[in-house]
Amino acid sequence: MLLTGYKRRFVGSPNDKQDQDHNFACETRLEQYILEGMCREHETIYQILTNFDAEGYDFYYAYQFPKWALEDMQDIPKDIAERFENVSIPAGTYIVFETERCQFPTAKMDELRTKAISQWLPTSGYELRNAPEIGIIHWFWEEGNDQLNNSRYCELWLPIAKK
């Protein structure tokens, strides 16, 4: 899978990313709008967590571009294109967890990851492998449509391998 996005170095554990994630999202609206416009997608946003070490990890907001949109990246001004990079997700096995459907499912991601790591993983016969973690935000929205707006959810993809 090839995604296009932008990153920031987060400190600490992915179990505690909520505040950093919120601040990053609020501070980078322009980048989000550029990518959404280029790929014509505003309901599916990817979060990529990679390059983990004792201090933290790289956190990306990214989008999956159609081939034609990736080719169009060559035609945008250099100062804009330099804000973004391609992130290649290697093939491998992932376990996928989902949040409940609600208006703000991103607020449920830290709790979901904590439960997956502390409750599911120890008894599963699997361990985390060295690959990016993926969050997929399904951010449906239509003005005045509470049923749709409350059906948003997130997927958490954890890279795993048999012990």
At which residue positions do the language-model features occur?
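A solvent-exposed interaction/effector surface
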Residues: 1-163
